[in-house]
């Protein structure tokens, strides 16, 4: 089979990717500027035209020579036997690229080339081929470089990057071939080797990245989508070979279980994306949804790849740059919090936006989207990903103070803090409490709980309702931080935050970080260690302070069984009154914390029992009897250490019966839970003397939340 030299052009920056792509097609090539060169057959060149996602033009190299003036140019073009390449009845057009030392006018070069070709045909055949700039049979390309002229015959009449599916596009369209390049560079081909590949584009625009990813996943040859594709009409063209290769490509498509999802905040753009997806025939693989990137959630079973090409700063955002930077800041937060183990690639020309992600790049590569120079930034979301030049505290302060400038609705929150503090002051003075709840979602738009721990604040955000704009909810949360700092004169570093919501993946059952900072607080005559940053809760439930006192008073100089004991705060209060205590909990961490609480209060922990066990299983085998039992189970638990899932409404009858089996006949069981819709079992009410003591156990600072817990005193009849 006859061999030729071919040059395959591409966008600057993706030459190595194109070289690798040709290797996968079985073609060895050499990297050149804006393309690659290879020796091969027409069949090899056809394969590139059909299968390449990255190529722009496949060109047969005709000749190269040094040219210093217009006569040299005419003679050089005339020296090529054009009748070996195409017939006189075939049309052609000429395109010029590059720069020449001696020719400033490319139209002049094009005219001289046309004259030389036409004159040659006329001199030999007495006929001349016609020029057709719209739909030619052949395209002749001259590339000028210094004093050299390179002549090529293009196999594809129009650029290969045009796939014909993009009927609708946004303001800043991404070339199809560049979208394919960043996908390959980001690792999509490796991702496709997984059992279920996952790709997300959280700012998908008209869907180009999504569609290119789907084409690769389904092994769809790009040329099959180009309804206007035209191969050259040269004497070297083999129509039968071309048709056979196209048929093989059609039969090579496959079914994929890849998950490819796109999100965008603009419904109009998404409508265009959806139509493009249908046009490309990949609607079975690609889904799109209207969503702000700052609300991005990981709802997938395994790690995947995020690839996106966001708007380019000033070019699209103009005077809304602050909004763009805030978007990237929120995007960085979502990646750090919810996408552990994922890989991320962001193509942008706006470096300031990348800084807002606050993530370390693993790789940077320069690409060109037309004339726009862009950078592909790649990240791996792991323990090393967080960028250190801005601490989390510094970031929180910056966002809090910026949020305070966006609206003044936080003034109402500040006024409520002042009002509540004024109302509680007499009670605080009387009791001496330094830990209390100051605010509990008193204003619906500020759905937070503010707990004061002396000079520290534990701020819990209740997860916003699905109908609430998540960005507004986030803004209000940071406004709350700002007002707590300003109104209560609390240092920013002493404001500790927590969001109550479902945890996933790496977030579950793990300490928040490695700070391991404990603080000492006072409650009545006891001291306790609390930790604001490392665990889901602080180590003490403030709403239980009264029932802890009831338990301690009842257990004075007696025996106490503390079930689901957590950090053993009730046990400490009882021990200070002379009780011998047994604390049972599944968590060794919390039991050790409890022992430290005993030591903090100068109580010999060795004289008390600390048992790590599933309380239900332990109660079933326990033979000891106790004077007082404190039973304070969680509303729901599915810990791996438990034999079964605990549901307090379903299981409280079993729990109470088992606990009563360990209670002396004249003893007292204090039962508490925080399930707001709790209903006591009629069988328990019938079997034992049960008294609801909610009102007795409700402290002054929790009066606005009267259903915060259910408390019962239970005795034998």
From Swiss-Prot:
It is found in: Cytoplasm. It is an enzyme of class 2 (transferase). InterPro entries: 23SrRNA_methyltr_KL, DNA_methylase_N6_adenine_CS, RlmKL-like_Mtase, RlmKL-like_Mtase_CS, RlmL_1st, SAM-dep_methyl-trfase, SAM-dependent_MTases_sf, THUMP_dom. PROSITE patterns: THUMP, UPF0020. Residues 44-155 form the THUMP domain. Its EC number is 2.1.1.173, 2.1.1.264. Belongs to the methyltransferase superfamily. RlmKL family. This is Ribosomal RNA large subunit methyltransferase K/L. It comes from Francisella tularensis subsp. mediasiatica (strain FSC147). The lineage of its organism: Bacteria, Pseudomonadati, Pseudomonadota, Gammaproteobacteria, Thiotrichales.
């Amino acid at each position: 089979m006859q061999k030729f030299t071919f040059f395959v052009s591409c966008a600057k920056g993706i030459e190595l990717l194109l070289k690798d792509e040709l290797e996968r097609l079985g073609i060895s090539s050499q990297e050149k500027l804006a393309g690659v060169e290879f020796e091969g057959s027409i069949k090899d060149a056809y394969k590139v035209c059909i299968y390449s996602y990255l190529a722009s033009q496949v060109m047969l190299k005709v000749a190269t020579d040094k040219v210093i003036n217009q006569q040299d140019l005419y003679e050089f073009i005339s020296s090529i036997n054009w009748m070996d390449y195409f017939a006189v009845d075939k049309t052609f057009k000429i395109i010029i690229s590059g720069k020449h030392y001696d020719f400033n006018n490319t139209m002049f070069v094009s005219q001289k080339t046309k004259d030389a070709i036409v004159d040659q045909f006329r001199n030999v055949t007495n006929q001349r081929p016609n020029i057709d700039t719209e739909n030619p049979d052949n395209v002749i390309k001259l590339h000028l470089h210094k004093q050299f002229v390179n002549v090529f015959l293009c196999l594809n009449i129009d650029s290969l990057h045009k796939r014909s599916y993009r009927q609708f596009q946004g303001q800043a369209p991404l070339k199809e071939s560049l979208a394919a390049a960043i996908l390959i560079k980001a690792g999509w081909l490796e991702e496709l080797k997984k059992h279920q590949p996952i790709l997300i584009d959280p700012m998908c625009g008209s869907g180009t990245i999504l569609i290119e990813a789907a084409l690769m996943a389904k092994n769809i040859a790009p040329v099959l989508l180009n309804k206007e594709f035209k191969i050259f009409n040269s004497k070297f063209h083999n129509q039968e070979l071309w048709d056979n290769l196209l048929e093989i490509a059609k039969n090579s498509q496959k079914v994929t279980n890849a998950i490819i999802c796109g999100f965008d905040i603009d419904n109009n753009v998404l409508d265009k994306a959806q139509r493009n997806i249908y046009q490309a025939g990949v609607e079975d693989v690609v889904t799109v949804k209207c969503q702000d990137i700052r609300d991005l959630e990981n709802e997938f079973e395994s790690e995947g790849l995020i690839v996106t090409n966001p708007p380019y700063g000033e070019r699209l955002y103009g005077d809304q740059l602050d909004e763009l930077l805030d978007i990237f800041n929120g995007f960085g937060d979502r990646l750090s919090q919810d996408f552990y183990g994922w890989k991320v690639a962001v193509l942008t020309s706006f470096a300031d936006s990348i800084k807002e992600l606050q993530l370390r790049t693993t790789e940077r590569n320069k690409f060109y989207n037309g004339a726009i120079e862009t950078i592909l930034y790649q990240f791996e979301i792991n323990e090393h990903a967080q960028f250190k030049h801005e601490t989390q505290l510094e970031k929180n302060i910056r966002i809090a103070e910026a949020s305070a400038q966006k609206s003044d609705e936080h003034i109402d929150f500040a006024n409520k803090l002042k009002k509540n503090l004024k109302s509680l002051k007499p009670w605080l003075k009387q009791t001496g409490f330094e830990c209390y709840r100051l605010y509990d979602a008193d204003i619906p738009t500020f759905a937070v709980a503010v707990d004061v721990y002396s000079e520290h604040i534990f701020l819990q955000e209740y997860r916003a309702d699905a109908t609430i704009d998540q960005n507004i909810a986030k803004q209000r949360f940071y406004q709350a931080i700002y007002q707590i700092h300003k109104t209560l004169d609390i240092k920013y570093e002493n404001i500790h935050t927590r969001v109550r919501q479902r945890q996933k993946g790496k977030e579950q059952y793990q300490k928040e970080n490695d700070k391991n900072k404990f603080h000492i607080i006072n409650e009545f005559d006891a001291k306790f260690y609390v930790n604001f940053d490392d665990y889901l809760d602080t180590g003490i439930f403030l709403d239980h302070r009264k029932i802890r006192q009831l338990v301690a008073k009842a257990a004075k100089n007696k025996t106490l069984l503390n079930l689901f004991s957590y950090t053993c705060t009730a046990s400490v209060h009882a021990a200070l009154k002379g009780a011998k205590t047994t604390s049972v909990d599944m968590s060794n961490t919390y039991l050790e914390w409890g022992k430290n609480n005993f030591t903090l209060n100068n109580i010999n922990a060795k004289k008390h029992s600390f048992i790590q066990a599933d309380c239900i299983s332990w109660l079933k085998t326990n033979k000891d009897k106790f004077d007082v039992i404190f039973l304070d189970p969680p509303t729901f638990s599915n810990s791996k250490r438990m034999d079964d899932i605990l549901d307090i409404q379903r299981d409280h009858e079993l729990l109470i019966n088992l606990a009563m089996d360990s209670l002396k006949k004249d003893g007292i069981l204090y039962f508490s839970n925080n399930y707001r819709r709790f209903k006591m079992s009629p069988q328990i009410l019938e079997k034992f003397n049960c008294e609801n003591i909610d009102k007795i156990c409700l402290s002054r600072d929790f009066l606005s939340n009267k259903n915060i817990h259910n408390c019962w005193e239970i005795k034998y009849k």
